A protein has these predicted regions:
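Bacterial N-terminal signal peptides
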Residues: 10-21
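N-terminal targeting signals for Sec/Tat export/insertion, comprising classic cleavable signal peptides
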Residues: 35-63
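General helical structural elements
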Residues: 8-11, 236
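N-terminal secretory signal peptides that target proteins for export/translocation
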Residues: 1-6
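Glycine-rich phosphate- or other oxyanion-binding loops that anchor nucleotides, phosphorylated ligands
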Residues: 31-35, 59-272
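Boundary at the C-terminal end of the N-terminal hydrophobic targeting segment
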Residues: 26-29
Length: 272
């Protein structure tokens, strides 16, 4: 056997595979301007998945992605688990493997603004963490997250993508039977069922709704340079009856949020 030939052939194969891998990676970094993504926990993203035509389901690292079309619009959904880490993982894999041009997190939330009622929909003008910072003798001192690789300090609240926000506002006008509000949505790794804590979030952050995933997805999207927005529908008042109210209103609230998410994509697609 000609060992030199075998060695050279092997090196050529490795070089070819490396070039192929780089070309695929570069392609993945180019956002697909006609592809839109909707992320949500499995039970709350179901209304979007049910509307997808020609659906193709794939699983990456345990995360389920479904690609298809709605009224000709190309959409991929990602099933996030509950909480910030699960949401971050789903968003990272979504952006890395599918390269959508925009991301919407669709789901439910607890009301921080007591004027909100179950099944109302909230457009997040911004989203941030309510439980990130330093615990001092005086209590929690909130601070922004940081990209330690670059040294960049993130904004205290991640703003919604301007085009997404404009599209959501326009789409909301079509939802005649659903009350739509907008404001700051805050994220933390605990299900909120405390009137005192709810009052604190309203007083200190001027938040309107609280949930467990949105800011994590927005932070990942910010790192990737992809616009994002969080759309939530209210299930409860984040008080002592939150668990029972969530169980009662989860499904119809998820449908309301999904409806606005799809309408938002439709408005956004008109400009593409």
């Amino acid at each position: 056997m000609n060992t030199r030939f075998v060695r050279h052939s092997y090196l050529a194969l490795l070089l070819g595979l490396s070039i192929f891998a780089v070309s695929v990676r570069l392609g993945a970094e180019q956002a697909d301007s006609r592809l839109f993504a909707v992320v949500g926990i499995a039970s709350e993203i179901a209304p979007v998945e049910a509307r997808l035509e020609g659906a193709i389901v794939s699983r990456i690292r345990g995360i389920v992605f479904t690609a298809g079309t709605i009224d000709g619009m190309r959409i991929v959904t990602a099933r996030s688990g509950v909480g910030k880490v699960s949401a971050s993982m789903a968003a990272t894999l979504l952006l890395d493997h599918f390269s959508p041009s925009a991301v919407i997190f669709s789901g439910t939330a607890g009301a921080v603004d007591i004027e909100l009622n179950p099944l109302d929909v909230v457009i997040g003008t911004g989203v941030g963490y309510h439980d990130y910072g330093d615990v001092t003798p005086e209590g929690l001192v909130r601070s922004p997250t940081r990209d330690y690789a670059s040294g960049r300090i993130d904004p205290a609240f991640f703003p919604a993508g301007p085009d997404l926000l404009a599209a959501a506002r326009k789409a909301a006008k079509e939802m005649k039977e659903t009350r739509v509000r907008e404001g700051l949505i805050v994220t933390g790794d605990a299900f909120m069922a405390s009137p005192a804590r709810r009052t604190e979030l309203r007083r200190e952050l001027n938040a309107v709704a609280v949930e467990m995933e949105g800011a994590a997805v927005a932070q990942v999207c910010s790192r990737f340079g992809v616009p994002a927005i969080v759309i939530r529908s209210i299930t409860d008042r984040a008080d002592g009856s939150a668990a029972q109210s969530y169980a009662k209103y989860r499904d119809p609230a998820a449908r309301n949020a999904a409806d606005l998410a799809v309408r938002t994509i439709r408005e956004l697609a008109k400009s593409k």
